[in-house]
Amino acid sequence: MDLSSDQLVMKIVEMGFEKLDALEAVKAVGGKSCDDAVEYILKGNHRTGGFKPASLLCSSGSNKILGKRAMPSSFSSSESKRQSSLLDHFRSVNQNKKKGDTFGTVEVDSQLETVSEHSEEVRKSLAPVFMESSCFPEGQLLNGCSEASSSWEKRVNSILRNRFGISSLRSFQREALSTWVAHKDCLVLAATGSGKSLCFQIPALLTGKVVVVISPLISLMHDQCLKLSRHKVSACFLGSGQLDNCIEEKAMQGMYQIIYVCPETVVRLIKPLQKLAKTHGIALFAIDEAHCVSKWGHDFRPHYRKLSVLRENFCASNLEFLEYDVPIMALTATATVNVQEDILESLHLSKETKIVLTSFFRPNLQFSVKHSRTKFASSYAKDFQNLVDLYSEKKNSTGKKLAVISRESEEQTDFGSHDSENIHETDYDEDEEDQENSLAKKNSSNGKELSEAYLEDETDIFQSVDDWDVACGEFCAMPSCELLEIPVPSEKQKDLEGLTIIYVPTRKESVNIAKYLCGVGLKAAAYNASLPKKHLRQVHQDFHDNKLQVVVATIAFGMGIDKKNVRKIIHYGWLQSLEAYYQEAGRAGRDGELAECVLYADLSRAPTLLPSRRSKEQTEQAYKMLSDCFRYGMNTSQCRAKILVEYFGEEFSSKKCNSCDVCTEGPPELVDVREEANLLFQVITAFHLQVDNDSEHAPYEDYGLGNSKQNKLSHKPNLLFFISKLREQCEKFKETDCLWWKGLARIMEAEGYIKEMDNKDRRVEIKFIQPTEKGKKQLDFQDDKPLYVYPEADMLLSLKQDRTYSGFSEWGKGWADPEIRRQRLERRERKPRRERKPRKKRTRGRSSTKLHPWRSKE
């Protein structure tokens, strides 16, 4: 049928060819027929000689792809009744070549006429639409399954070289792919930045089937799709941030090699995915960030828990056209032994599931812990001085520009109203309280529960940060020529190489620290879920373009980031879990060079659990993880890398890493605490003896505990009670800080001498103490055998603090001394109390105005 030139070009483009190729072909054949134009392109007479199938291009309609994978389900061959084996695809090209029959009609669109049969050359091009052509050179096609099984790795290496510029597979990647080739499920645990993504990207290129990847974040899926397009792999993502409904329709027609989808969406798409598996084939279901499956993990997501529907709905016993179950590959960088077991059970993976483990040890990461009162802005100057000095060395060429940028940024009125040259500090000069109230009002309208300091929690992250309004969710496979056009970094970008990410617990801190860093001349940006999406996208882009030096962020930032030149990760405040810490710290040093991972924490205070929506069971687990973080920070004698690696169940091969602060500075001197431990244990034992016997069996009065009011309060005295009684009985330890005794109690608990009295409620550190049988045997009152221990961080901190008095009693006695009284009064006069006006935006402020109307008039 003859068509006009424009219609003919449109029809050829919808088949999947480039528009320029179509124009040239139509012009060459005189616009006579579609068949002639297609044949002209396929014979290599056109401009580039390249055939681009629809699966590798972003077409505008909901059309179906060309070739074997687009054949209607009614195709007469018996092979179409079932999804073939993975290895069948290794020889499919050879089989198609031998067949004498022609292909059936190729459906392009319901309104288009069928394309007639083409020559043998056309059939060769159409059959392996998704196949990696470089893996199947002429004359080297496989003839049998055994040959396919023995040579698949060679083909993978060819794909790696041609598509990704990688010479060969790593050992864990080879093991994971071997498991997939054997049609078995797999759980891959590999360190961040080790190349887990290749484990599920290769199957799509190797077989020509579709790979479905479940991923938790839209931003993560967006980045992955963009990277794949640069490697000539077509991909799309489906989820709440996907605004184009046509993309889902095209994805379910098999038009993309890899489909990224969020867990909430994949449950809805079970039926369309089953149809996709029947018509085109699904090579693999990959569950990225699989730790989100486990309720014991640090990043549990309820919708991940529902992914067991994949095993239930894509097994050979339920679908007749499947010869084997569609393999499931779960991947994560952080999972303890308990989390691993929970993942396998929750996903209903088979008993033959292979667990692929790599070492969690990253030798180029230097871990350290430093004391800081992170809640106070007065600590910023001391804590970030090294950071300022680091970037000041590179400031000579850009110093003047930074000053201008800082002034310009103060004039901005919106977090997103800046160009690529502006610093990401916006209207920080506004009243901080008004800014917080406006953010709270904005978020409360969405029905979100936020704490006073706008704490980041799981729900908030995935609902706010990840709901980006992405303009395009499908990504074309870019031609090779585009891959070579890698932009050369400018001198300015080179000066900014070596980025820093500062993780903070609250949104307020992210803004305050970013403001401070901008004030001292650094190029910094705040990133948290309450900021406008435009600002977040700009920060994300500038971070990747090396236009920033520091990003100050909550946990909303960083998942899936593959930035090679991050030189320092700072956690400013206590951690919530070691899993999250190791994952976030692993974003540094991905180029293999040395990188620092520093934890700043107030070692004088135990961490508190950030508020979030948790069940009672999850709360107990959260406290356990918080306690592990606390002990990690207090450690002064054991290699930090060893602690982290063994936390994930891996046996650390060497005694130390020789790079963390403990290994480089060495542990503190051993201290004999036999006397202190015995004394504390005696006080504890005496109390419990009287409580248990409720008689005169124990000389309770001898320890000053006889008529204590605390004894009547549920018989549950806390550690501070015992410390106060110990001080009363022993003048020698009257000046010893409570912080030191807390550290000693923690050591005694670790040794098994004492334990928590109440096991119902989880706590970060021991509070209600009772002695153990081991303690009664080991801590013999008459035994003078020394008990040497390494003082922990809080114990060392207490020894450094200058104390002029011991406790509140000593402080109160100081008022009786005329000189001390005079000094204290002078300090008050020098720093008069600031009169605070009532804040009418708060209930307390409005009430104060009504009760004290004269204050508001002043």
Curated annotation (Swiss-Prot):
Which molecular function terms from Gene Ontology are attached? 3'-5' DNA helicase activity; ATP binding; ATP hydrolysis activity; DNA binding; metal ion binding
The top of its lineage is: Eukaryota, Viridiplantae, Streptophyta, Embryophyta, Tracheophyta
> Where expressed (tissues)?
Mostly expressed in roots and seedlings, and, to a lower extent, in leaves, shoots, shoot apical mersitem, inflorescences, flowers, siliques and seeds.
The record, for SUPFAM superfamilies, names: P-loop containing nucleoside triphosphate hydrolases (SSF52540), UBA-like (SSF46934)
Q: What is this protein called?
A: ATP-dependent DNA helicase Q-like SIM
Q: Which domain of life is it from?
A: Eukaryota
SMART domains xrefs: DEXDc (SM00487), HELICc (SM00490)
- Which residues are recorded as binding ATP? 190-197
